Amino acid sequence: MSELQTTPSPEIRLKENISKKPETMTKIFWEKFSKNKLAILGAVILFIIIMSAVFAPLIAPYPQEQQSLLDKYKAPGLEHLMGTDKFGRDIFSRILYGARVSLLVGFASVVGSILIGTVLGALAGYFRGIVDAVIMRVVDIVLSIPDIFLLITLVTIFKPGVDKLILIFCLTGWTTTARLVRGEFLSLRSREYVLAAKTIGTKTHKIIFSHILPNALGPIIVSATLKVGSVILAESALSYLGFGIQPPIASWGNMLQDAQNFTVMIQAWWYPLFPGLFILMTVLCFNFVGDGLRDALDPKNIK
Amino acid sequence: MSTLLEVNNLKTYFFRKKEPIPAVDGVDFHISKGETVALVGESGSGKSITSLSIMGLVQSSGGKIMDGSIKLEDKDLTSFTENDYCKIRGNEVSMIFQEPMTSLNPVLTIGEQITEVLIYHKNMKKKEARQRAVELLQMVGFSRAEQIMKEYPHRLSGGMRQRVMIAIALSCNPKLLIADEPTTALDVTIQAQVLELMKDLCQKFNTSILLITHDLGVVSEAADRVIVMYCGQVVENATVDDLFLEPLHPYTEGLLTSIPVIDGEIDKLNAIKGSVPTPDNLPPGCRFAPRCPKAMDKCWTNQPSLLTHKSGRTVRCFLYEEEGAEQS
């Protein structure tokens, strides 16, 4: 490259009025996110729940399936932090192990459905025309079937289990993401920097995935966060109905189902209370974090 | 000078409900190596569509090249596939846009955006490309190029971004640079600097420039030759000096007299009456006839063809038919 003169010509050297430290995207993001107290609280609680789920075998005082019929329906106390159930199993331990199932199902199905939805939505929004029409009609069809019935039907066909549940949530959950991403792409594809990228010879797949997609990442992350909460709810609902995680494996949903008995609810209030409380808290925290992320990632929301 | 780009009878049409709309209708011109050619005309005259046709990008906005050829040296670009085009875009032909504020990707750093071209076209390693990118940034006048590499576009001013765009466009040493109103969105002092920079660098690399603009001030400053377009057709093709001294086509004359003169004593600016007809509603005769002060009877019914004037310039007007001009 010897033909190039690399010294800047002084007459065109302009004042570069830039402060010393470049403001990175991460820094701007943290500044905005940390202003939202609820989101921070949600993130902290979620972090604790996730950590205790990961280290459940170390934290849990009892194995999740250890029965002790003599200790059944024990009220919360020093020996059993959250009491025991009808088989004398420690509820605290079961909630820790249940968190593993609920969070695993939540995260894995969201990652799966976001991946499917993003790729299909990106293709539909970028290429438009026939590709768009086909993908969006499939979305319409999947969306027109009530989720819970589809889930129940699919669960009865396949045997219920963690992997099957994740698969089913992926197959039903990608549609809304696909719509969201398609919308983003429809507006982003006609931006001038996309045309500029084309004029320097960038290949189509690079334009889609490394030029346009990063610009659409904000809404995708937000919807993913909110989605984790709703998948955890759906999993609990399925387990509660008996179509989800099967006992003796603990999940918050099937613990609630165990407790659905009037006498149990009256005599052992701790039995339904704690699983319910954890479902509520986790979903709420995901929603708080999602809201915080939305505000922090919205480029229009400049301090 | 040998010819770099030759456009012959280019027809780019758009379609609305199967109805063809001629945005570019039979455009001929050529650009020699190292030459700066300005493409001038009002909005809607087909300037930008001509440039997008050369870049092979009209298809993605719904247009179609119906006829004609675009030759870059010995390659016929109209027969190129998308893959062939990807290899020459940015490498042999590159482009600068009007809006520097929106033509850089907001989520990628300046460094990422420059190195991308180098890695793709020059097969450079990441480190090598970074080094070259710093050189390029210094070349377009950034003294703290290393730091600019890590910046995101929103931290730069319009002029700085346009210089980054120039660095990207020239990074692979292209043969032709298409500049689509490169200075329109900049303020006047920066305009001159950017224009100067572009000309300097292109001279250094022996790059030809196709300068698309409606600013005749920019034309007189930067171009060697001017092509005036009206309604998708070339109406006049002359060197800058000839054109400003003696405009032949009434439309060119109109354009020139509608520039304000700083020390002039005219209190009302001359404007070309009427407006550009839309491409789906063109007059049957000369396309300028309805707005032309010198229109004759036959202008309303017959289409003039591009004539070679005795001075060697070409003009599309019946006024010059009798003056011994011959049809080209």
UniProtKB/Swiss-Prot annotation, chain A:
Transmembrane segments: 39-59, 103-123, 138-158, 165-183, 212-232, 269-289
PANTHER family associated with the record: D,D-DIPEPTIDE TRANSPORT SYSTEM PERMEASE PROTEIN DDPC-RELATED, OLIGOPEPTIDE TRANSPORT SYSTEM PERMEASE PROTEIN APPC
Keyword set, alphabetical order: Cell membrane, Competence, Membrane, Peptide transport, Protein transport, Sporulation, Transmembrane, Transmembrane helix, Transport
Main location per the UniProt record: membrane
Protein name (database record): Oligopeptide transport system permease protein AppC
Species: Bacillus subtilis (strain 168)
Domain of life: Bacteria
GO BP: establishment of competence for transformation; peptide transport; protein transport; sporulation resulting in formation of a cellular spore
UniProt keyword annotation of Endoplasmic reticulum present: no
Family according to the record: Belongs to the binding-protein-dependent transport system permease family. OppBC subfamily.
MF-aspect GO terms: transmembrane transporter activity
Role according to the record: This protein is a component of an oligopeptide permease, a binding protein-dependent transport system. This APP system can completely substitute for the OPP system in both sporulation and genetic competence, though, unlike OPP, is incapable of transporting tripeptides. Probably responsible for the translocation of the substrate across the membrane.
Keyword Transcription applies: no
InterPro entries linked to this entry: BP-dependent_transpt_permease, MetI-like, MetI-like_sf, Oligopeptide_permease_AppC, OppC_N
Protein's membrane topology: Multi-pass membrane protein
Subcellular location: Cell membrane
Pfam families according to UniProt: BPD_transp_1, OppC_N
GO CC annotation terms, alphabetical: plasma membrane
From Swiss-Prot, chain B:
Annotated ABC transporter domain residues: 5-256
UniProt: ATP binding residues: 41-48
Entry keyword annotation includes Phosphoprotein: no
The organism's place on the tree of life at top rank: Bacteria
Keyword Protease set for record: no
Sorted UniProt keywords: ATP-binding, Cell membrane, Competence, Membrane, Nucleotide-binding, Peptide transport, Protein transport, Sporulation, Transport
Membrane topology value: Peripheral membrane protein
Matching PROSITE patterns: ABC_TRANSPORTER_1, ABC_TRANSPORTER_2
Annotated compartments: Cell membrane
GO terms, biological process: establishment of competence for transformation; peptide transport; protein transport; sporulation resulting in formation of a cellular spore
Any single GO CC term annotated in Swiss-Prot or TrEMBL for this entry: plasma membrane
Any one Gene Ontology molecular-function term assigned to this protein's record: ATP binding
Annotated InterPro entries: AAA+_ATPase (IPR003593), ABC_Ni/Peptide_Import (IPR050388), ABC_transporter-like_ATP-bd (IPR003439), ABC_transporter-like_CS (IPR017871), Oligopep_ABC_C (IPR013563), P-loop_NTPase (IPR027417)
Location, primary (coarse class): membrane
Cited function: This protein is a component of an oligopeptide permease, a binding protein-dependent transport system. This APP system can completely substitute for the OPP system in both sporulation and genetic competence, though, unlike OPP, is incapable of transporting tripeptides. Probably responsible for energy coupling to the transport system.
Family named by the database record: Belongs to the ABC transporter superfamily.
Name of the protein this chain belongs to: Oligopeptide transport ATP-binding protein AppD
Gene: appD
